[in-house]
Amino acid sequence: MLENRVKTKQIFIGGVAIGGDAPISTQSMTFSKTADIESTKNQIDRFKLAGADLVRVAVSNEKDALALKELKKVSPLPLIADIHFHYKFALIAAQSVDAIRINPGNIGSKDKIKAVVDACKEKNIPIRIGVNAGSLEKQFDQKYGPTPKGMVESALYNAKLLEDLDFTDFKISLKASDVVRTIEAYRMLRPLVIYPFHLGVTEAGNLFSSSIKSAMALGGLLMEGIGDTMRVSITGELENEIKVARAILRHSGRLKEGINWISCPTCGRIEANLVDMASKVEKRLSHIKTPLDISVMGCVVNALGEAKHADMAIAFGNRSGLIIKEGKVIHKLAEKDLFETFVIEVENLAKEREKSLKD
């Protein structure tokens, strides 16, 4: 059952609202050297085209920190500076970026955290308390180990530090590399704080591994009403992180956008190369943002039943096929004419739906 979202304190990263009633935002992270402004800008442009709302960049040295001023001028997305170990880089970064991410496990003493908070206060930018199971502070790691309890205790401790410094513009993440610890940690912390949550599974692996882990962990939490912004971490192509994240949002009921694809797993009845055709159709219609249920079936046996619930369906037969709109057959065509006609019909339906929404 899809539960109502937990209402959290709202913060802003650039012009993007996080928490409260704001849509759940997606973000990713560049892998270029941040000081290489041209390469980093190119990667950010790719994220923007893929539909990202925010982007995070690594600040590994002073050169990276100083480059943020110029990068901010050309970035099409709000910038988050990712800081580990060296708090002074955060002080430089805060002068240019839209948010700072710190890892409480390695940022240093209370005095160093205070310095970062003061810099963020001055520029009116938020902080992410980014807790990682693999790098907890010594006191929590020794007492609890890399467990959900240890992660939650670290988050609560650092949230209290920021609150004591009269700073409440922050969000929290609790990341582990597996599904169970991730879900348990967020569930445990949710009733204890009002702050927005950044969801993610850290070091989740390649496209296949990460998609499974992220769909289970993030999708489950989203359906429970938990989560305000998210990143799907993938070892692979940049755009895939945003593509998978937005798919998780759609299928967890948190984003009403784009096509919900329905296609059969194939069997001995199919009369066409359904695998290639389904891939071809999905690629050709990937630009559509209108919420539609589209069915691609290898035979009429399944198609007629599935099409009753689909906005548009295509069913392949013996060198011919059907196009079905809202449960009614509108075309019976030779196979060579099916694909282009189907694409046109889906595009026209999307336009009809968009027009009706505006009217």
From Swiss-Prot:
Keywords: 4Fe-4S, Iron, Iron-sulfur, Isoprene biosynthesis, Metal-binding, Oxidoreductase. [4Fe-4S] cluster binds at C264, C267, C299, E306. Belongs to the IspG family. It catalyses: (2E)-4-hydroxy-3-methylbut-2-enyl diphosphate + oxidized [flavodoxin] + H2O + 2 H(+) = 2-C-methyl-D-erythritol 2,4-cyclic diphosphate + reduced [flavodoxin]. Disulfide bonds: none annotated. The gene is ispG. It comes from Helicobacter pylori (strain J99 / ATCC 700824). This is 4-hydroxy-3-methylbut-2-en-1-yl diphosphate synthase (flavodoxin). The keyword Amino-acid biosynthesis does not apply.
